[in-house]
Every structure is written in structure tokens, then in C-alpha cells.
Amino acid sequence: MSKRAFNFCAGPAALPDAVLQRAQAELLDWRGKGLSVMEMSHRSDDYVAIASKAEQDLRDLLDIPSDYKVLFLQGGASQQFAEIPLNLLPEDGVADYIDTGIWSKKAIEEARRYGTVNVAASAKEYDYFAIPGQNEWTLTKDAAYVHYASNETIGGLEFDWIPETGDVPLVTDMSSDILSRPLDVSRFGLIYAGAQKNIGPSGLVVVIVREDLLGRARSVCPTMLNYKIAADNGSMYNTPATYSWYLSGLVFEWLKEQGGVTAMEQRNRAKKDLLYKTIDASDFYTNPIQPSARSWMNVPFRLADERLDKPFLEGAEARGLLNLKGHRSVGGMRASIYNALGLDAVEALVAYMAEFEKEHG
């Protein structure tokens, strides 16, 4: 078998080697049953046990309170942009949104299709290089909810604090930083996360929702998008993304074996510190984000001369450092360093960066 590359893709992202090896071993014959998980009925006792264990492991990892439902749904995080207002925003209500980049803007645009949106703060004033402090926000007193993206995968901004919204439910898109460090779930009304970054493969979105927020869906809300129906049916109103759910469960097991989210925080801190230190110590590489708002998971950086982007990427790929090209809307480079990537991946990257700078700087 050839050596595994270091995959810095923003999503679908790297999965732990141990998880892939386990899935490979169980692919044709899951625990002596003579069939693959992909072939199981989602109603079977075996699959229900797989799904239930995955949920419990996630609850353990994030210490999710008992009055929260955990849903394993389809449609990805982008579908949640519509699902949230359909479930939580009354026709005559107002929802507050915080704009910190492309993904929060997409959420805002979609929510406006279903009701009144107040953009309570925007990082546009800072060219999306910093996050407005809460003292700059203009929140609506009786808003249906306050929505923000805890980490902007493309721009590389991340909240290092949780907003205070009083009795107004706080809703957050945690697609790219969930499970990267400890989290007080009780501060939120709803958390959602597309799986393909820190949870598992694509095709799945996890929603953690406080029970008192269920049953508020509008009459026009499609059955398949109604949180209460999903919760009442154990996320199996229809056939779920069974294999993605199973693989996510293997990731949760792996995370627990590694020491949980506390261990991940230490590991991720070491990775991001090394990469940002390398960028900041150089005149050849730059990252424009205010230090307090820098993402732990997605690190964008530019070279001194964009004409060097192509040879940089070619050299990186030759060394097994894959998917470092920045998003088309931003350009430059982006290293996504989710849980599955170890410190050795970042060490290999910064060694190459130093080598490339020495040759071209």
C-alpha cells in the first residue's frame, strides 16, 4: 500500500486512518453478520444499535444535556439555512443574524425567503478580517433567535467566545469546528454541523436542538424538514444516510479513544500555533485575520507573489501535501487542519513552506 497523503481539504476532509481501516475491515462482513452496514435495513436491531451508540458517544463527547435532542439528518448544513427559519421563525417574527463571511451570508439570504432578518452585526466593516465585538451588535429585543457561524471555513474567522443572548435562543453553524475543543452546549438553543469536516463523510448533518424549540414549525414546513417529526422518529422518518451515520459513529469512538475533546483542544492548539507562528515569522507568507479571530481549523495564507501559487501547489502535491488551494472566492492557500490531521501533517507543511520560501523568497 502506498503512503497516505496529508489531506488539507476543507471538506470532504481527512478521516482518521484508524476509522478507515476499521470500516475497510467491516465492509463486506459486519461483525460476522455476512453483510455490509450499507446493506442493512435501517429498522434492523443491528443498525438501530449502531445509530444509538453513535448518538450516545456524541452526547458523551460534548456532554449534551438530557433536554436536547440529537438529530442525524440529510441535506447538509446548507439545507439548515432554510430549515431553521421554517422551524423557529414565526411569520410575524424577526431573526437576528451575524455576518462574518460567506457561509453566514448564505444563511442570511436563505432566511430572508421566509421572514424578516435583522443583520445585527457584520464583519464587512473590518473587511471580514475581524469579528465585531458584541458591544457593536444591534440585537432585536424579542428576536425568534440569534444565528451566527462559529467558524467561517472560507475566510478563516472563528469566534473564540460564545455570544450572550439572554432568553433569545442562540443558533450556530458549527460545521467546521464542532468537536475541536470543549463546548458548553447548554448556552445554545440549536447547533448544527455538516458532517464532512470534523464528524465523518458527507451526506449527513447533525442537529443538536433544545426540546422546548420543537413543535414550532410553520404549517408550510415540509414534513421532511420538521425537527419535531425527525425527533419523534429517531431521525428515521425516512431512510437515513446509514453509512455516513455509521462512519460518524466510528469517528466518535476514535475521538473518545484519543481522550475526547479536551485532548483534541491540546492537539489542535499545537497545530494552529505552529502554522500561524510560521506564517507570522515570514515576510513571504501572510494571513490578514486579526489574531483573536483566527480560525483553529481553517488557515488561509497568501504568498508574496501570486504567480508562485501554481508552483507552490505543484511542489506540495509532489510531497503528499494535498488540497492546499484556497477557495475560489478568496484565492491564495488554505490549510484545513481538522481533528483527523495530526501535528505531523502541519510539521510537514511548515517544513515545505520554509523550503519553498528559501528557494523563491
Swiss-Prot record:
Pathway: Amino-acid biosynthesis; L-serine biosynthesis; L-serine from 3-phospho-D-glycerate: step 2/3; Cofactor biosynthesis; pyridoxine 5'-phosphate biosynthesis; pyridoxine 5'-phosphate from D-erythrose 4-phosphate: step 3/5. Its EC number is 2.6.1.52. One of its GO terms (biological process) is L-serine biosynthetic process. Its cofactor is pyridoxal 5'-phosphate. CDD domains: PSAT_like. It is found in: Cytoplasm. Gene3D superfamilies: Aspartate Aminotransferase, domain 1 (3.90.1150.10), Type I PLP-dependent aspartate aminotransferase-like (Major domain) (3.40.640.10). It comes from the Bacteria. Coiled coil: none annotated. InterPro entries: Aminotrans_V_dom (IPR000192), Pser_aminoTfrase (IPR022278), PyrdxlP-dep_Trfase (IPR015424), PyrdxlP-dep_Trfase_major (IPR015421), PyrdxlP-dep_Trfase_small (IPR015422). SUPFAM superfamilies: PLP-dependent transferases (SSF53383). Keywords: Amino-acid biosynthesis, Aminotransferase, Cytoplasm, Pyridoxal phosphate, Pyridoxine biosynthesis, Serine biosynthesis, Transferase. It catalyses: O-phospho-L-serine + 2-oxoglutarate = 3-phosphooxypyruvate + L-glutamate; 4-(phosphooxy)-L-threonine + 2-oxoglutarate = (R)-3-hydroxy-2-oxo-4-phosphooxybutanoate + L-glutamate. The keyword Amino-acid biosynthesis applies. Binds 1 pyridoxal phosphate per subunit. It is an enzyme of class 2 (transferase). GO terms for molecular function: O-phospho-L-serine:2-oxoglutarate aminotransferase activity; pyridoxal phosphate binding. Belongs to the class-V pyridoxal-phosphate-dependent aminotransferase family. SerC subfamily. Catalyzes the reversible conversion of 3-phosphohydroxypyruvate to phosphoserine and of 3-hydroxy-2-oxo-4-phosphonooxybutanoate to phosphohydroxythreonine. This is Phosphoserine aminotransferase. The lineage of its organism: Bacteria, Pseudomonadati, Pseudomonadota, Gammaproteobacteria, Pseudomonadales.
